[in-house]
Amino acid sequence: MQSDDRSVREGSDSSQTFLMKMAQPTGELTHPSQQQQLQLQQQSFQSIFGGASDTTEEIDTETDSNHRRPHSFGAAATTPAKLANKNVAPFLVKHIPEQYGPLGSRRTDKLEDLSSPNSKFCYRHRPDLKCRRQADEPSMDKLQRELETLPPSDQQGIAHVWSLFSAAPAKHRKLILQGIMAQCCFPQLSFVSATVRDLIRIDFLTALPPEISFKILCYLDTTSLCKAAQVSSRWRALADDDVVWHRMCEQHIHRKCKKCGWGLPLLERKRLRESKREIELRATTWDVSGPAQNAGGAECSAPHADDVITQKRKADSSDDETAIVKRHCSSLDARPEPDEDYYTTRYRPWKEVYKDRFKVGTNWKYGRCSTKVFKGHTNGVMCLQFEDNILATGSYDATIKIWDTETGEELRTLRGHQSGIRCLQFDDTKLISGSMDRSLKVWNWRTGECISTYTGHRGGVIGLHFDATILASASVDKTVKIWNFEDKSTFLLRGHTDWVNAVRVDTTSRTVFSASDDCTVRLWDLDTKACLRTFHGHVGQVQQVVPLPREFEFEDHDAECDNDNMSTTSGDTESNSLQATLGLESNATETSVFGPSFDNGRPAPPRYIVTSALDSTIRLWETTTGRCLRTFFGHLEGVWALGADTLRIVSGAEDRMVKIWDPRTGKCERTFTGHSGPVTCIGLGDSRFATGSEDCEVRMYSFRN
């Protein structure tokens, strides 16, 4: 301790000598203001190195009275060691311990705040706070080199001034700074201003808790997030984390973002929703010191593959949500217990998922795609469906062909129908087809075997759709037939007055939509077998009806329907018909508007449907009110084929054109040509779509690459 005091005293001597020397006038001071300014400087030095009264008592004689003049420091210069020993050293000894551990006075055992030992400091001065600014290595290196150019005595003086300021409490620091700033000239003040502008910046993301940092980053768009990741390694870990990009995927994938207007192609929404809880928990336990994969999300600690599915997006994107979920459900039981390599290689970070979807979405927007043509049928292609790398097509040549979409190779041909095939649908295990020979056939499409044949219609089958255990078929005989695979029951839905061209089953609400040549669309209740609602508006035969996913959102102020030219009728009450005709909204719940057969516990049918007709138009409807929200104009002839999801509508018509529409604005985004005959069928996926035509060809447009 004695050596420390000795070094402090030596530093004090040199620093006082330095200060006195710096304050020496370079010439005779004649102006009163200059004399007054120098007198203030002397008083400030005396306040640091000792009171004027103590010094005066020792040297205040008649002979040396001239030393009290502003331009003379002779007396002060003769006793630097005494003044430093008396004032500077005690100042440092008193304040330095309190600067780094303010637990009370050194002479007492009283603790001021055990829970927060640095409670005396603001958030910028607390030594234990993470946001305390680190030293700037280039600046400090430059400062060191400039300091070394000065004489040793000047170096010690400057260093001791720094020590005094560093040891001073906050109140003292403000006084010192105010005194220094008062003596600075304009160039010096300009230098201070430029320097402070950079010094007052803090790394707020590092200082805040991780969950708050993630909350801030979730407000940024993708461009800003990518720029934030370039700031530092810490920012990169935060900006690239699954917590942020899961939210970005949730906001954009399979829906239009209300902020930026962007929507990205389909993703398994079920997994996206299920993983939300895991992501929220992860945000509160995030640690940058963890493994590098923590930010990217390649590592998982879930004990079972089910948990992995809820956390990570499967590496190989697919085109249909339902089929993917079914495939995983059927294969999880036989899947071995996964290890860490399984997670790392099979599941990607959400940022990679978003990047892949964004690339596909951009290709959709600008029409960048590759085209593949499938030739093999000898008559017009009337129906098709694709899933992963499998494409099934049905034709008026009475055959069904199975294709490999990657190679374009024809895998097999299914033969058995006696007339043209108008409709088909397949899943992992079976393919069901409907033909003008009045029959439906169930096939094992992997082997080509016909498993069973169903007859029940008195006319050709021109439309079918199955969901879970319910199959609906539409026929030339003006009826819709419901087949229940579970209890083997069947029944007919009668009401249309002309051919029924298309049907769609919604097992969630236990309802069926049907489109007919009588220019109407009907909504049926499978429980009561009653028609809940009839949609009028088309002036041509309605060829297709497609319910939109429940995630689809439409702003009412965007509606531009002409209610004078459309109407809807309900199978229950006239009041509902009048209300829907006028476009008024009911005060009842969404389910009750469909009649007493719907109780509060029964899910409502899909809220929006899209229809196409031979009047060359496409219409968007709201099922709860029966309103036509939008009419799409652009095709020159009747629209035969239709596909839709939450982001777009794809239509094919007699005019041999395929058009892509924005369902919210009604704008035609792009038109594709290439077929030499009417476009009769369309299949739509997340990154591609396929069209079939009476020219016997199938064309597939891929936006993936």
Curated annotation (Swiss-Prot):
PANTHER family: UBIQUITIN LIGASE SPECIFICITY FACTOR/HREP PROTEIN, UBIQUITIN-BINDING SDF UBIQUITIN LIGASE COMPLEX SUBUNIT. Keywords: Repeat, Transcription, Transcription regulation, Ubl conjugation pathway, WD repeat. Gene3D superfamilies: 1.20.1280.50, YVTN repeat-like/Quinoprotein amine dehydrogenase. The keyword Transmembrane helix does not apply. Pathway: Protein modification; protein ubiquitination. It comes from Aspergillus oryzae (strain ATCC 42149 / RIB 40) (Yellow koji mold). InterPro entries: F-box-like_dom_sf, F-box_dom, G-protein_beta_WD-40_rep, SCF_subunit_WD-repeat, WD40/YVTN_repeat-like_dom_sf, WD40_repeat_CS, WD40_repeat_dom_sf, WD40_rpt. Residues 33-42 have a biased composition (Low complexity). Residues 202-248 form the F-box domain. Residues 1-42, 55-80 are annotated as: Disordered. Component of the SCF(sconB) E3 ubiquitin ligase complex. This is Probable E3 ubiquitin ligase complex SCF subunit sconB. GO terms for biological process: protein ubiquitination. Residues 1-12 have a biased composition (Basic and acidic residues). The gene is sconB. Component of the SCF(sconB) E3 ubiquitin ligase complex involved in the regulation of sulfur metabolite repression, probably by mediating the inactivation or degradation of the metR transcription factor. Disulfide bonds: none annotated. Belongs to the WD repeat MET30/SCONB/SCON-2 family.
